[in-house]
Amino acid sequence: MSTEGPQQPMLVAGLTQSKKLIKVGMASSAFIAKDADAKIINLVAELCRVNNVKCDMAKTKKELGIMCGIDVDCAVCVTLN
């Protein structure tokens, strides 16, 4: 019997990678920082709507970067299927 708990979903950070993964159907959900540029917010939200991907807003780019385990701010990230 395995003693491991449920695995955390894999996060991929960054606009370019996130857009690609949403378009090819590999993203299960997307997170967008509320303080991201309006063009980015609108672009990713529309991609998610068109491709049936759940889209949530994160508080800040800094917090999203921390959530992704990176040392820089992050405007967008996705979880993989």
Predicted regions and their residues:
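Alpha-helical transmembrane segments of helical membrane proteins, especially in multi-pass transport
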Residues: 31-32
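Short beta->alpha linker loops
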Residues: 35-36, 59
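Short, glycine/polar-rich helix-capping loops at beta-to-alpha or helix-loop-helix junctions
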Residues: 40-41
